[in-house]
Regions:
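Preference for protein termini
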Residues: 1-388
Length: 388
């Protein structure tokens, strides 16, 4: 595993915009470029094969731990409010279908990957991983800037397409509403998912998350025309929804969510402790606990639900800023990320492995400027070098 420097493509910004990726530049809330045009991470085929095996094993373990937590009545430990327990259990018992999730891993090129956390319900950086880095590779190959035979671990687009086709073919999903916050990245992500669904036979329309309606005399959530929403592809965190004024509707609506309501368990960082409990000898699962202090001092403390590295405490450091500081926490054994030097300082990459349904399908990398991956992280493409 190496970090390679490359000159920017002459028209790289235009190329990103062509595939719907428009948030690549720095902003006040993301003060560094979100897309890394000047470097990539390189792996050997053997390293990627090992990552695939590790990530698939972790996917299986995560889903098994999810089912055990739900069926064992341990959802309170995961931070899921009591009024939702029956609905989450019903979603699991129905086997409500899933489209995707992302596993975030620590890996330095040797040995096994280790699970840092699971982005189960609202994973982003999807267009970057599925489309933009593939376009980047094609451009680099065409320009002769990488060796012939260079490839990527990237069948994300194909995997998601097949998963939508499965929902249409086997699960009766022929129409869905697609919804997100009114943010450029979120809208682009659900638009991409809607395009994939449409190609697979699932028609769809967009509405903003704050436009999803409720009515006491309706069994379903409602769209802006007050028509029933039967399937909702909702890029909106369940933990936001269950704290809203309409939270009670989550527990009794007949609207089926994509991602399903059972993903509230998968997405809780408390599941990291359940994973360690179930698989204490796995080299892929870091020790973790819901009892602070029981693992000693060399731990990372994380709220059960948090985003962009907020309210995370590394060993010997103060807590990062954020809005999740009042939530219960999980403590996880500290796994040091590898360090790679860039011209303007060190980079600490986290490997995001994408899962379509229950099958791993590709890799995306975000490199932070600190050991907590936060809003100063940059997406970096990757390559698999040909065997010499």
């Amino acid at each position: 595993m190496r970090r390679l420097s490359l000159p920017p493509r002459p028209n790289w910004e235009e190329r990103l915009r062509e595939v719907g990726f428009t948030w690549y530049a720095p902003t006040p809330t993301h003060p560094v470029p979100y897309w890394g045009e000047d470097a990539c991470y390189a792996f050997t085929p053997t390293q990627i094969e090992g990552l695939k095996r590790d990530a698939q094993d972790l996917t299986n373990m995560v889903l098994e731990a999810t089912g055990a937590a739900i069926e064992g009545g341990r959802m309170r430990e995961l931070g899921i409010p009591t009024f939702l327990h029956d609905a989450v259990r019903a979603s699991w018992d129905r086997d409500d279908p899933t489209v995707y999730m992302r596993l975030d891993l620590a890996y330095d090129g040797s040995g096994h990957a280790r699970l840092l956390e699971v982005n189960a319900q609202t994973p982003t950086s999807l267009i970057e991983a599925a489309v933009s880095q593939w376009q980047w590779l094609e451009d680099r190959l065409a320009a002769g800037e990488v060796a012939a035979g260079t490839s990527q671990w990237n069948t994300i687009h194909e995997g998601l397409s097949e998963q939508w086709a499965y929902l249409a073919r086997e699960r009766g999903v022929t129409q869905a509403h697609f919804s997100s916050a009114r943010e450029v990245e979120d809208i682009a992500t659900v638009t991409y998912l809607r395009d994939l669904a449409g190609a697979a036979g699932v028609s769809g329309s967009f509405l903003a998350a704050d436009e999803v309606g409720t009515s006491p005399d309706q069994r379903f959530l409602l769209d802006t025309w007050t028509l029933p929403i039967r399937h909702l592809m909702w890029l909106w965190p369940f933990e936001y929804a269950w704290e809203s004024r309409d939270a009670a509707f989550l527990s009794n609506t007949e609207t089926r969510f994509i991602e399903p309501l059972w993903k509230a368990a998968t997405g809780s960082k408390g599941l990291l402790a359940h994973l360690h409990e179930r698989y204490p000898d796995s080299g892929l699962v870091l020790p973790a606990t819901l009892t602070p202090g029981s693992l000693g001092e060399n731990v990372v403390r994380k709220p059960l639900y948090s985003r962009e590295g907020q309210n995370v405490t590394l060993p010997g450091q103060t807590q990062t800023a954020g809005v999740y500081g009042d939530l219960p926490v999980v403590e996880q054994a500290y796994a040091e990320l590898p360090t790679f030097e860039a011209e303007d300082g060190p980079r600490y990459p986290v490997l995001g492995v994408w899962v379509a349904g229950d099958e791993v399908c590709g890799l995306g990398i975000r490199e932070g400027r600190s050991r907590v991956t936060d809003n100063r992280a940059t997406f970096a493409p990757h390559v698999i070098l040909p065997v010499q």
